[in-house]
């Protein structure tokens, strides 16, 4: 999806009056992530989590190719709409976890979000899998929010 198509998603209408948005972003795409936060009616607050990537089969750091330097970390931005309440003050920002499938984020992130915000209604957009307690929407899962008002383009499979 293009940035314009992403900005047009009705996230502002889906989100509760007092809600939090957690958005993964790579460093080269930070300007687009911040644009998307504003388009969806949220205000950027902080970097909620920093994922330091380990190799899957060795106790060493994973390094991608990067644009300027060999990249490792990804950030999960935190933005809010209204005045959501933090439920815990002991949630650490760092997530040290091995890489898994391409673009799959660490599962522990969901647990940290629930601990931080409480057991509230929540949805994962562009989900790669279903998770207990989470509604999902994306081209790799059966959506649990069919009234989202748009469809996620299906992955094109090539031989």
Residue ranges and their predicted role:
Residues 1-159:
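Class I S-adenosyl-L-methionine-dependent methyltransferase catalytic core
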């Amino acid at each position: 999806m293009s940035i314009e198509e992403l900005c047009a998603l009705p996230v502002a209408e889906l989100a509760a009056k007092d809600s939090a948005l957690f958005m993964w972003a790579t460093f080269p795409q930070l300007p687009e992530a911040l644009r998307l936060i504003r388009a969806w009616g949220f205000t950027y607050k902080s970097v909620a989590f920093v994922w330091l990537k380990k190799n899957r089969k060795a106790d060493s750091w994973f390094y991608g190719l990067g644009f300027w330097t060999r990249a490792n970390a990804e950030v999960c931005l935190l933005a809010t709409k209204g005045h959501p309440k933090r439920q815990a003050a002991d949630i650490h920002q760092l997530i040290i976890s091995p890489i898994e499938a391409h673009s799959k984020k660490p599962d522990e992130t969901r647990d940290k979000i629930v601990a931080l915000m409480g057991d509230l209604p929540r949805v994962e957009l562009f989900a790669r899998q279903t998770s207990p307690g989470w509604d999902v929407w994306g081209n790799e899962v059966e959506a649990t929010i069919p009234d989202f008002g748009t469809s996620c383009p299906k992955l094109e499979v090539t031989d």
